[in-house]
């Protein structure tokens, strides 16, 4: 298995650790700022701790990795034997992570191709896996970037949140959309579109919204070979129920991942998040 092309992503890809290890993928952590503490996602703050902080209405913000952190990562990967790096990151509409990676790539000891996938969570994770598999098959930088781009182009992400307040506070959704949702007391279904979070539908109750989310995901999956990821924050039972229902509805299902999002995404969605990523093969 070739490691000449190394894959770097960020902590919002939420890839299982064993999957990252198997494919040699490195994740650069984003930071959650809880009060006056800056904590690395994945190692210094858990999703559960984040959910508790949000429920207590503590001040929570997030920040990108610095260019210096990316530069150190690129050097370490090159020293481990990589002759080129594909660095795949969450949407630049949602974070400055891509910009930090671009700055660091200019000083890297080996060629680095930095890609704004326009994705987040396992929508980003599936892109990183596609790039890694292209490298393992003997492809170079161009092939790995193309594989990630192809996966991103076909991938969709949908999610339900209990309230739009967290997205509004973090500037990830327009104030007008958030105000409309709150004023009408509706439950929003959102989607990732062109790298931005957009309102897809407004439903009257949580149960109807989750049922509608299931319908949307099943329709998007179609009948061909497809991977699905179900994400949640502090809603494990709801995530398992959604996953089980999708298993019975999607004939071409290959892999189904169920996981809790990390603290960075959780900070902007709040507890009760249920989401699904649809990634055709």
Per-region residue spans from a language model:
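Glycine-rich phosphate- or other oxyanion-binding loops that anchor nucleotides, phosphorylated ligands
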Residues: 56-103, 141, 145, 152-155
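N-terminal glycine-rich anion-binding loop in soluble enzyme alpha/beta folds
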Residues: 5-71
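Short beta->alpha junction loops
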Residues: 64-65, 116-118
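Short catalytic-loop micro-motif centered on adjacent basic/acidic residues
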Residues: 61, 87, 114, 229-230
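Glycine-rich phosphate/diphosphate-binding loops that line cofactor/substrate pockets in enzymes
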Residues: 1, 72-83, 216-225
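A general structural signal for short secondary-structure boundary/capping elements
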Residues: 52-57, 74, 133-134, 277
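Mixed-charge interfacial surface used for oligomerization/domain docking
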Residues: 3-6, 12-26, 30-33, 97-113, ...
């Amino acid at each position: 298995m070739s490691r000449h092309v190394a894959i770097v992503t960020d902590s919002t890809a939420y890839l299982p650790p064993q999957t990252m290890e198997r494919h040699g993928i490195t994740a650069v952590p984003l930071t959650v700022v809880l009060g006056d503490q800056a904590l690395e996602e994945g190692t210094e703050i858990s999703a559960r701790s984040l959910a508790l902080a949000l429920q207590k209405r503590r001040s929570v913000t997030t920040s990108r990795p610095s260019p210096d952190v990316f530069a150190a990562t690129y050097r370490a990967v090159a020293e481990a034997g990589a002759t080129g790096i594909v660095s795949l990151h969450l949407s630049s509409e949602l974070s400055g992570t891509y910009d930090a990676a671009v700055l660091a790539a200019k000083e890297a000891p080996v060629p680095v191709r930095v890609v704004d996938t326009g994705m987040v969570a396992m929508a980003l994770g599936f892109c990183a896996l596609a790039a890694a598999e292209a490298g393992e098959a003997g492809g170079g930088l161009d092939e790995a970037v193309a594989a990630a781009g192809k996966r991103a182009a076909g991938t969709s992400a949908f999610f339900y949140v209990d309230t739009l307040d967290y997205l509004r506070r973090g500037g990830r959704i327009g104030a007008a959309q958030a105000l409309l949702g709150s004023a009408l007391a509706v439950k929003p279904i959102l989607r990732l579109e062109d790298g931005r979070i957009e309102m897809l539908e407004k439903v009257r109750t949580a149960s109807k919204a989750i049922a509608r989310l299931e319908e949307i995901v099943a329709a998007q999956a179609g009948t061909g070979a497809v991977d699905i990821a179900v994400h949640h924050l502090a809603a494990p039972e709801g995530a398992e129920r959604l996953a089980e229902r999708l298993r019975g509805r999607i004939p071409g299902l290959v892999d189904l991942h169920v996981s809790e999002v990390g603290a960075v995404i959780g900070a902007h969605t709040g507890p009760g998040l249920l989401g699904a990523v649809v990634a055709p093969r």
